[in-house]
From Swiss-Prot:
Record's keyword terms, sorted: Plasmid, Sporulation, Toxin, Virulence
Gene name in the database record: cry4Aa
Family the entry assigns: Belongs to the delta endotoxin family.
InterPro entries: Cry1Ac-like_dom-VII, Cry_V, Galactose-bd-like_sf, Pest_crys, Pest_crys_dom-III, Pest_crys_dom_I, Pest_crys_N_sf, Pest_cryst_cen_dom_sf
Gene3D superfamilies according to UniProt: Galactose-binding domain-like (2.60.120.260), Pesticidal crystal protein, central domain (2.100.10.10), Pesticidal crystal protein, N-terminal domain (1.20.190.10)
UniProt key word Glycoprotein: no
Ranges in a coiled coil: none
Additional free-text comment from the UniProt record: Toxic segment of the protein is located in the N-terminus. Diverse amino acid mutations in sequence block 667-676 have no direct effect on the insecticidal activity but alter the structural stability of the toxin protein molecule.
SUPFAM superfamilies hit by this protein: delta-Endotoxin (insectocide), middle domain, delta-Endotoxin (insectocide), N-terminal domain, Galactose-binding domain-like
Pfam family, one: Cry1Ac_D5
Protein name: Pesticidal crystal protein Cry4Aa
Record GO terms (molecular function): signaling receptor binding; toxin activity
Keyword DNA-binding: no
Biological processes annotated in GO: sporulation resulting in formation of a cellular spore; symbiont-mediated killing of host cell
Lineage: Bacteria, Bacillati, Bacillota, Bacilli, Bacillales
């Protein structure tokens, strides 16, 4: 009876602790032979013997599991991964050295391992080099044994008895080991042949040894920092002798991490390039892809996997244990003997036999098609993979690889959740008997769930084979060395394996004896299928473990030191995690690289169910657009400031979105990290916060007595520093917080006193400023501290645009001669806001368009206590370092106008010449919006003294000053001329200088002409704002008032109502085709037909004489007339003909016999134009 037909047994396998299950979606027994019994031994010696003595096929299996050096690599990486999971200060060193010493320095032959490291690389590349160099390299490396062993023994002694002497011994040994590697590693690199190409090859050969030595050095430096910090916190060790402390070791550690990382990756890539550029003589001068892949696979396990863990040694970034994962894939190859290079170029082989960068996948099933035949020697023709993304329940199907025919039969091996293949045997027909592409006949799969072993198989046809076969074992060595095993097998076991099968690809070779080349892709067993967020460790989750990716985002190849690929983040991606402790709080941060500038910083948001949305702007980390060779320093960490406590849900979705508009800004996401917040971490963060604020405020001052601020320090910087002070814990640091608050208040007062601009922070509303109506002072935006200026768009009234503006003139008395002043401020957001700063004529004219990309940093609403900035993601914007972001919007003296995009902070300069308090030129600062859809929020506006000018700047300002004086002289002359003419015309209107009465013969035309002359006076209004007074505004107002007086007197003495037709035909009786038209700015009554008539009845004083005065013109044939008639039918008539050119004035004296008269206007033919009609009493 087959043991797996028992339902309860199958369910027992399903209830896995870590890994193994068979999916119900597939045939449980897709093969003819029953599966073998479960093998529960951890020693595979018996299993190997069974394979090698297989009676059906005969012969031995060729193993792809290297002994010696490859197992050493996987064990070292496994040991380091395990060591980082320990949170005790000495965990990594004690566990690490206890495992690494017997691996790197085996007791039976201490020189073997280092020699094997070098030999295995030499066997891949196969280039000659003098053996003396290799021998010397081994000697250099083996000198490390005694140093490391002595240090390890002292550590164990101290652990058992941490007395002062043992403590001092450990400190001494740390220093000795550090000095040793400081000398040995450079010596290893520098002991190369003198020829540059031979030197490069030598360094490629010793690279794996270099990486192992670097790892030992970093382990010691990491331990040094932790050990010294431990001693500092235990004051009974205060009397120890002076030696380097954690403060001394930490910068050495971080520099070593960077240097070792960059060197390893650079040298590794040199090896790849050497293979790609070195033709293989055995392949007719072509490039050998198999050699390339073998080098890549072995150097990944030997070097890159280890290098990817180097950042974890940084105690500052990882103060507690860390859970890391390696998501890269490596490949083992079957059937490469029938040379593919004859048919395909190198790149085609690479694309066909490896997977392109992709989200991390988990194998769901392997599905092979067997040839439709009943005879012996059957084989698989083609196959496809089913897989899923991490914590995604949707299974994806790969392409079908091979030569599939519709008659082929499908056989599948299904894998349920948490079941993995860690080893497989492959039996394939010998190539010379093949008549079709595929040649695998049988595969045995060794499967684990972490607690038990299951073997399954896929067999083509009946399994009967009469031909010769090839037998191969695929897999990778164990992950951990167990000290109680003595000399354990290197073959993986169900509970000690370093890799699992993730994918199978193949490439058909159209050779005489047709062959299918297979690659088996393996991923590291450190990858967690559940994305578990740990409560006691810093959890690293690679970004490629996302299960959803936006259409614009993609996965790109990693630089070699990240342990896997990266997400090129353009729109969004989602990661699903699991978490069980709902009381634990976390900080979340990302490790990333970005080429954004200070003005085009990418902005990301993080959405988590049950958690307020998080957001932050990413600082640029590298320049340029090439991200294929990024160095260690090109990746940085950035943390969301909010603490996060996950909702009670086992699966948690984290959705990352980009909310900026800078699509050309590259953002590469490496990892998402979760830092559990403990009391010690919180206290450490508060201490760091305090020290950071203290350092920031200490940079404010230009002298020790702190009475002068640094010129580059902005008022906005001080406000933000005040916010940081407010966020310091009063519980932990009440005294320090109060002292810092006094410091920042002092800085604010100094900032205000040096600002020659009044009320630049708008704390006194608009005091000192002149504004339009649609200006408001608000305090509801946490981007600013306190009040800020809000400008709405220009008003559009019936097609007329009325700009929004605010300006201030700095009086001459506040300025110094021949001095440069900084004009700067902060823009929360704006569109089409124009900044004009002028003394001698628009020295600064800038349009500022700044996106509202800071809102993600702050909550959108205030509570009764205001905005809680301490729970936001706000990061101080380079306080004290303004060379980058703060002054990126600057004026170019070579341009008259500047358009500033994106920069929130602006800074310009303006220079003064000689001062003249009588002229009071001053400095004008103005903000203006001329478009209805414009807007702006501004604050922290400053004009401060930078210093005296000299040299070219002094010459330039003197030139500008002279030019301005010349222009002003010309303007004054022009003004005086216009003023004199206008004044003379106005004086002629009146009978006396008091303007009490008009001259009797003053006409409307004369008044209108005088008004025209007044309107012609130049420079009445500001050059930039049409309703703001200019240099001639006062004289204009004076003359305009006299014209208004004349007009008033004119209207008062005219007995006829609306005699100038400015109110249309109001007061007149109209018949026929007559109306009032605007002609050359004057209201004119127009009669266009003989049938039209206009009349008005007027009441007069009896027995008074009157003058009837008409200004009119006639066009065309006929006459135009104005008739005055009294009730006694006495009349006077003024007649106009077209013979009289233009408008003429005609008068007639009338002496009505009655107190009522009628004024009638008409014409006989053509058109008649009347500009004004007056009836004036002769007594006026």
């Amino acid at each position: 009876m087959n043991p797996y037909q028992n339902k309860n047994e199958y369910e027992t396998l399903n209830a896995s602790q870590k890994k193994l299950n068979i999916s119900n979606n597939y045939t449980r027994y897709p093969i003819e032979n029953s599966p073998k019994q479960l093998l529960q031994s951890t020693n595979y010696k018996d299993w190997l013997n069974m394979c090698q003595q297989n009676q059906q096929y005969g012969g031995d299996f060729e193993t792809f599991i290297d002994s010696g050096e490859l197992s050493a690599y996987t064990i070292v990486v496994g040991t380091v991964l395990t060591g980082f999971g320990f949170t005790t200060p000495l965990g990594l060193a004690l566990i690490g050295f206890g495992t690494l010493i017997p691996v790197l320095f085996p007791a039976q032959d201490q020189s073997n391992t280092w020699s094997d490291f070098i030999t295995q690389t030499k066997n891949i590349i196969k280039k000659e080099i003098a053996s003396t160099y290799i021998s010397n390299a081994n000697k250099i490396l083996n000198r490390s044994f005694n140093v490391i062993s002595t240090y390890h023994n002292h550590l164990k002694t101290w652990e058992n008895n941490p007395n002062p002497q043992n403590t001092q011994d450990v400190r001494t040994q740390i220093q000795l080991v550090h000095y040793h590697f400081q000398n040995v590693i450079p010596e290893l690199v520098n002991s190369c042949p003198p020829n540059p190409s031979d030197c490069d090859y030598y360094n490629i050969l010793v690279l794996s040894s270099y990486a192992q030595a670097a790892n030992l050095h970093l382990t010691v430096l990491n331990q040094a920092v932790k050990f010294e910090a431990y001693l500092k916190n235990n004051r009974q060790f205060d009397y120890l002798e002076p030696l380097p402390t954690a403060i001394d070791y930490y910068p050495v550690l971080t520099k070593a991490i960077e240097d070792y990382t960059n060197y390893c990756v650079t040298t590794y890539k040199k090896g790849l390039n050497l293979i790609k550029t070195t033709p293989d003589s055995n392949l007719d001068g072509n490039i050998n892809w198999n050699t390339y892949n073998t080098y890549r696979t072995k150097m990944t396990t030997a070097v890159l996997d280890l290098v990817a863990l180097f950042p974890n040694y940084d105690v500052g970034k990882y103060p507690i244990g860390v859970q890391s994962e390696l998501t890269r894939e490596i490949y083992q190859v079957l059937n490469f003997e029938e040379s593919p290079y004859k048919y395909y170029d190198f790149q085609y082989q690479e694309d066909s036999l490896t997977r392109r960068p992709h989200l991390f996948t988990w194998l769901d099933s392997l599905n092979f098609y067997e040839k439709a035949q009943t005879t012996p020697n059957n084989f698989f023709t083609s196959h496809y993979n089913m897989f899923h993304y991490t914590l995604d329940n949707i299974s994806q199907k790969s392409s079908v690889f091979g030569n599939h025919n519709v008659t082929d039969k499908l056989k599948s091996l299904g894998l349920a959740t948490n079941i993995y293949i860690f080893l497989l045997n492959v039996i394939s027909l010998d190539n010379k008997y093949l008549n079709d592409y595929n040649n695998i006949s049988k595969m045995d799969f060794f499967i684990t769930n972490g607690t038990r072993l299951l073997e399954k198989e896929l067999t083509a046809g009946s399994g009967q084979i009469t031909y010769d076969v090839n037998k191969n074992i695929f897999g990778l060595p164990i992950l951990k060395r167990r000290e109680n095993q003595g000399n354990p097998t290197l073959f993986p076991t169900y509970d000690n394996y370093s890799h699992i099968l993730s994918f199978i690809k193949s490439l058909s070779i159209p050779a005489t004896y047709k062959t299918q080349v297979y690659t088996f892709a393996w991923t590291h067993s450190s990858v967690d299928p559940k994305n578990t967020i740990y409560t006691h460790l810093t959890t690293q989750i690679p970004a490629v473990k996302a299960n959803s990716l936006g259409t614009a985002s993609k996965v790109v190849q990693g630089p070699g030191h990240t342990g896997g690929d990266l997400i090129d983040f353009k729109d969004h991606f989602k990661i699903t995690c699991q978490h069980s402790n709902f009381q634990q709080s976390y900080f979340i941060r990302i490790r990333y690289a970005s080429n954004g500038s200070a003005n085009t910083r990418a902005v990301i948001n993080l959405s988590i169910p049950g958690v307020a949305e998080l957001g932050m702007a990413l600082n640029p980390t590298f320049s340029g657009t090439d991200y294929t060779n990024l160095k260690y320093k090109d990746f940085q960490y950035l943390e969301f400031s909010n603490e996060v406590k996950f909702a009670p849900n086992q699966n948690i979705s984290l959705v990352f979105n980009r909310s900026d508009v800078y699509t050309n800004t590259t953002v590469l996401i490496d990892k998402i990290e979760f830092l559990p917040i403990t009391r010690s971490i919180r206290e450490d963060r508060e201490k760091q916060k305090l020290e950071t604020v203290q350092q920031i405020i200490n940079t404010f001052y230009a002298n020790p007595i702190k009475n002068t601020l640094q010129s580059e320090l902005t008022d906005y910087d001080i406000d933000q520093a005040a916010n940081l002070v407010e966020c310091i814990s009063e519980e932990l640091y009440p005294k320090e917080k109060m002292l810092l608050l006094d410091e920042v208040k002092n800085a604010k007062q100094l900032s205000q006193s040096r600002n020659v601009l009044q009320n630049g922070d708008f704390e006194s509303a608009t005091l000192g400023w002149t504004t339009s109506d649609n200006i408001t002072i608000q305090e509801d935006d946490p981007i600013f501290k306190g009040h800020y200026l809000h400008m709405s768009g220009a008003r559009d009234i019936d097609g007329t645009i009325f700009p929004t503006y605010i300006f201030q003139k700095i009086d001459e008395s506040k300025l110094k001669p021949y001095t440069r002043y900084l004009v700067r401020g902060f823009v929360g957001s704006s569109k089409d806001v124009e900044l004009v700063v002028s003394r001698y004529g628009e020295e600064i004219d800038a349009i500022m368009n700044v996106p509202a990309d800071l809102n993600y940093l702050y909550p959108s609403t205030f509570d009764c206590e205001g905005s809680n900035r301490c729970e936001t993601s706000a990061v101080p914007a380079n306080i004290g370092n303004t060379s980058d972001m703060l002054y990126s919007c600057q004026y170019d003296t070579g341009k008259k106008h500047v358009v500033c995009q994106d920069s929130h902070q602006f800074s310009f300069t303006i220079d003064t010449g000689a001062l003249d308090t009588n002229e009071n030129i001053g400095v004008w600062v103005m903000f203006k919006i001329s478009s209805p859809d414009g807007y702006a929020s501004l604050d922290n506006l400053e004009v401060i003294e930078e210093g005296p000018i000299d040299g070219e700047a002094l010459s330039r300002v003197k030139h500008m000053e002279k030019k301005w004086n010349d222009q002003m002289e010309a303007k004054r002359s022009e003004t005086q001329q216009a003023y004199d003419v206008a004044k003379q015309a106005i004086d002629a209107l009146f009978t006396n200088v008091q303007d009490e009465a008009l001259q009797f013969d003053t006409t409307l035309a004369q008044i209108q002409y005088a008004e025209y002359l007044v309107q012609s006076i130049p420079y009445v209004y500001n050059d930039w704002l049409s309703d703001v007074p200019g240099m001639n505004y006062d004289i204009y107002v004076e003359l305009d008032a006299r014209v208004a007086q004349a007009r008033y007197l004119y209207d008062t003495r005219n007995i006829i109502k609306n005699g100038d037709f400015t109110q249309g035909v109001m007061g007149w009786h109209v018949t026929g085709n007559a109306d009032v038209q605007q002609i050359d700015g004057v209201s004119v009554l127009v009669l266009s037909n003989w049938s039209a008539g206009v009349s008005q009845n007027v009441h007069l004083q009896h027995n008074h004489g009157y003058v009837l005065r008409v200004i009119a013109k006639k066009e065309g044939p006929g006459n135009g007339y104005v008739t005055l008639m009294d009730c006694e039918e006495n009349q006077e008539k003024l007649t106009f003909t077209s013979c009289e050119e233009g408008y003429i004035t005609k008068t007639v004296d009338v002496f009505p016999d009655t107190d009522r008269v009628r004024i009638e206007i008409g014409e006989t033919e053509g058109s008649f134009y009347i500009e004004s009609i007056e009836l004036i009493c002769m007594n006026e």
